[in-house]
């Protein structure tokens, strides 16, 4: 077992130092943010504690009629207000910033002129998109609001190919064709499409070399770690995405490629309606010799055709159906006498969600520490805490390992969180993640296995496609020494909560857009901030142009080989 670390011990001093450097407050002035709702719109009032102890709200200027684009002066005030709200609300991850070598507020500030000088709705909307993306957070995005900026108008389209990243050299990543819609390619009269083949290397995208493409489209791609960035860049090469400004695309996708013999050629691929594209993958079969015995919304269950004592879970999601899906898995496993079998969980195709600890309680035979979380105390967090404190408990049945009624969250908001706000702490004290599996009084965060559970050895196959709750799922296995891990790290973008707010031009009733903030840290069972700090697998096997045709079967075989060896 790994060393027992009290959760929160690694909320390093550098976090508070980073926050204090970003929040330039006068020593004797305590600043709060409060949301003031009036006549159906929202304003931000900044309350300062002066020596006399009285609070004064900043009064809005006289409301004027505007268009959603505003004026240069109002756009600059809007920009300043976003920077200030971000400075006081955002839960920064030193791990993420150090790993990617950037400062989010500096990158946001560099976009000032783009916002101020916007002349059209598209200019402003996509400028604000870049402003949001500058924080490099997979969770955060813009949402159009009534009477505000219209937002994306160009529908999504995709070219009839699939692209994957080659991770063999993280300093010079490359991309290659991993799948084709041969029917659409054969029907196309565009030049070069007849030469496109699975495995061909991408040399340029719409005239941009790969380094230029990465540098240009990084700003348009929400990500929290380099592996996730390259995954999403590859995924989106064939896609004309509405969240990216339309002027970033051509009428068709122009690629320069290199074939298996090293010969270069150009191809122009048409953009098509996404639901008409059907991709044939280069990795035609993920798990040869295994057959699906159960299909559920959140995972598929496979067993080997040769009768080996192995259960393979192809994990897909963590949605509400997970409760029943896991019940079905355990009932089937108990009936088939599988609970002592070797368990391999492939999460490379999974997204996020919740209730992962509930599933783990039925997959392991030892107590384990769950993830923890906190909130950075600000106006946004205070409103969330106040709302939870008065929210009624849900009338739902109790389930072992789950608190679906949210009563533990409500109790925390009424007691511990309220005390932390009153004590003017920078962050609330760490509690079991979202109080979904344990109450705030559980300081060690230890969860017990369910009465019926798996008892065999476990391996996790990871990859950068997904993150968020998936990051937590893998970290609970890895940090508690419950499983062998192989493959690549997950996306690394788990947090506790996001705050959303409709932005208005300051002093007016003119809405602009809904903006988001990451307002709390997820803490791994080892006490470290999770965002930008996903589990590094024990055996790192990068996806490459050379191994993609057999990648999953190779990892599965390696995992089974490792689990079959005695542990020294």
Predicted regions mapped to residue ranges:
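Short, well-structured beta-strand/strand-turn elements
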Residues: 467, 481-494
């Amino acid at each position: 077992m790994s060393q027992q670390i009290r959760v929160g011990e690694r909320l390093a001093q550098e976090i508070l130092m980073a926050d204090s450097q970003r929040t330039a407050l006068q020593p004797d002035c305590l600043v709060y943010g409060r949301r003031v709702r009036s006549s159906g719109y929202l304003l931000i009032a900044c309350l300062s504690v002066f020596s006399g102890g009285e609070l004064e709200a900043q009064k809005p200027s006289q409301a004027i009629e505007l268009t959603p684009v505003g004026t240069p002066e109002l756009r600059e005030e809007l920009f300043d207000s976003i920077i200030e709200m971000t400075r006081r609300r955002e839960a920064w991850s030193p791990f993420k910033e150090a790993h990617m070598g950037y400062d989010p507020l500096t990158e946001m500030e560099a976009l000032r002129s783009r916002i101020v000088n916007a002349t059209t709705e598209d200019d402003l909307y996509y400028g604000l998109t870049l402003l949001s993306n500058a924080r490099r957070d997979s969770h955060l995005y813009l949402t159009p609001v009534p009477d505000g900026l219209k937002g994306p108008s160009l529908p999504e389209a995709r070219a009839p190919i699939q692209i994957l990243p080659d991770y063999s050299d993280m300093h010079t990543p490359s991309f290659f064709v991993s799948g084709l819609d041969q029917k659409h390619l054969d029907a196309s009269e565009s030049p070069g499409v007849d030469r496109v083949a699975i495995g061909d290397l991408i040399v340029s995208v719409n005239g941009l070399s790969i380094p230029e493409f990465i540098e240009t489209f990084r700003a348009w791609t929400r990500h929290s770690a380099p592996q996730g960035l390259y995954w999403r860049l590859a995924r989106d090469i064939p896609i004309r995405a509405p969240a990216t400004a339309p002027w970033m695309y051509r009428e068709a996708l122009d690629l320069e490629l290199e074939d298996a013999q090293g010969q270069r050629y150009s191809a122009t691929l048409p953009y098509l309606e996404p639901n008409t594209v059907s991709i044939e993958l280069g990795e035609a079969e993920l798990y040869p010799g295994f057959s699906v015995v159960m299909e559920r919304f959140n995972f598929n269950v496979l067993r080997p055709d040769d009768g080996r004592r192995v259960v393979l879970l192809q994990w897909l999601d963590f949605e509400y159906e997970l409760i029943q899906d896991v019940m079905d898995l355990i009932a089937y496993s108990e009936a088939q006498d599988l609970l002592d079998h070797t368990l391999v969980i492939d999460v490379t195709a999974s997204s996020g969600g919740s209730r992962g600890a509930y599933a783990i309680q039925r997959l392991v035979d030892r107590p384990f520490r769950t993830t923890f979380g906190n909130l950075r105390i600000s106006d946004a967090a205070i409103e969330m805490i106040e709302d939870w404190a008065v929210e009624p408990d849900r009338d739902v049945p109790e389930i072992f390992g789950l608190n679906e009624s949210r009563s533990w969250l409500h109790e925390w908001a009424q007691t511990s969180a309220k005390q932390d706000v009153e004590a003017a702490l920078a962050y609330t004290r760490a509690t079991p993640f979202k109080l979904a599996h344990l109450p705030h009084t559980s300081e060690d965060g230890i969860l017990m296995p369910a009465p019926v559970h798996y008892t065999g050895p476990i391996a996790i196959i990871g990859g950068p496609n997904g993150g968020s709750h998936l990051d937590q799922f893998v970290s609970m296995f890895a940090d508690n020494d419950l499983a062998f891990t192989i493959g690549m790290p997950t996306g690394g973008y788990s947090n506790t909560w996001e705050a959303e707010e409709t932005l208005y031009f300051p002093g007016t009733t003119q809405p602009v857009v809904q903006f988001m903030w990451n307002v709390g840290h997820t803490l791994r069972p080892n006490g470290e901030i999770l965002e930008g700090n996903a589990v590094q697998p024990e055996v790192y096997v990068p996806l490459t142009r050379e191994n993609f045709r057999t990648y999953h079967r190779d990892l599965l075989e390696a995992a089974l080989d490792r689990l079959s060896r005695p542990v020294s």
